[in-house]
Amino acid sequence: MQTNLLKPKTINVEQLGHNRAKVALEPFERGYGHTLGNAIRRVLLSSMVGYAATEVTIAGVLHEYSSIDGVQEDVVNILLNLKGVVFKLHNRDEVTLSLRKDGEGVVTARDIQTPHDVEIVNPDHVIAHLSQGGKLDMQIKVEKGRGYVPGNLRRYADESTKSIGRIVLDASFSPVKRVSYTVESARVEQRTDLDKLVVEIETNGAITAEDAVRASAKILVEQLAVFAQLEGGELAAFDTPAGPRGSATFDPILLRPVDELELTVRSANCLKAENIYYIGDLIQRTENELLKTPNLGRKSLNEIKEVLASRGLTLGMKLENWPPAGLDKR
């Protein structure tokens, strides 16, 4: 009698438009479509890392219940519009940006001055309208975070750094705007009682829909891993399984060659020159170690970090008992 549970053999990703996609997986055993679909949906809505404006200082404004001469919107509406700007920070957790504009016209997210490692996904988003003689001068603090954090929580926590005119915002960090899932019927040979899981997701553009699904699955795997270690005492780290060499089980992605990361030819050749053939080899290197690699500069390093981050990995991770026995080091 067959006792092994079926795992999906078919994965289909359908782009539905800008920042929208539909991911379909089949077949699942009966009931697993709802079990996994609901879990992924909840993680996508609550636990994705994103970026948001958290504090604002506007020249000449002491509090949010003010108006500015020459600006059509009052401060409350300016702040509401600012919350709609989608930021993306590369290799940093926070940044303070400046916006200065005067004269008649529309103020958009494009007017925010950004360094090279900060990206504005929707530069045409309108923040305010200036009339003749109007001026808007503001400092915007953008931070990396997870979920939704009300401003009053951070306002009291940061009381020691409070300054006159500092306006603390409610921050919605989640890059996921909408998620829904459906479970359809699937068939394998004579079995017709199987599930097909279809997840439809829309993001704000700071992360692709496919990467969001991958990240949510990674979170679920890490959280559920502790249930496999119910022996009491300290829990072994998921990424560093203990045991004699050859007995450890690693995340399958770590056993894949670095070629699957689809890095530029320059970056890939630099890694191979340092005997880095597998993703598990790569994540154990630190930034400083990679920067010492001949011909591998900061641009290549940033590329590597972004590709790893899209898969829920970082540099500087520790893996005990690596490499596993029998791994071809070429």
UniProtKB/Swiss-Prot annotation:
The keyword Coiled coil does not apply. It catalyses: RNA(n) + a ribonucleoside 5'-triphosphate = RNA(n+1) + diphosphate. Residues 1-231 are annotated as: Alpha N-terminal domain (alpha-NTD). One of its GO terms (cellular component) is DNA-directed RNA polymerase complex. Keywords: DNA-directed RNA polymerase, Nucleotidyltransferase, Transcription, Transferase. GO terms for biological process: DNA-templated transcription. InterPro entries: DNA-dir_RNA_pol_insert, DNA-dir_RNA_pol_RpoA/D/Rpb3, DNA-dir_RpoA, RBP11-like, RNAP_asu_C, RNApol_insert_sf. One of its GO terms (molecular function) is protein dimerization activity. Residues 250-330 are annotated as: Alpha C-terminal domain (alpha-CTD). SMART domains: RPOLD. Its EC number is 2.7.7.6. The N-terminal domain is essential for RNAP assembly and basal transcription, whereas the C-terminal domain is involved in interaction with transcriptional regulators and with upstream promoter elements. DNA-dependent RNA polymerase catalyzes the transcription of DNA into RNA using the four ribonucleoside triphosphates as substrates. Homodimer. The RNAP catalytic core consists of 2 alpha, 1 beta, 1 beta' and 1 omega subunit. When a sigma factor is associated with the core the holoenzyme is formed, which can initiate transcription. HAMAP family: RNApol_bact_RpoA (MF_00059). NCBIfam families: PRK05182.1-2, PRK05182.2-5, rpoA. Belongs to the RNA polymerase alpha chain family. This is DNA-directed RNA polymerase subunit alpha. It comes from Paracidovorax citrulli (strain AAC00-1) (Acidovorax citrulli).
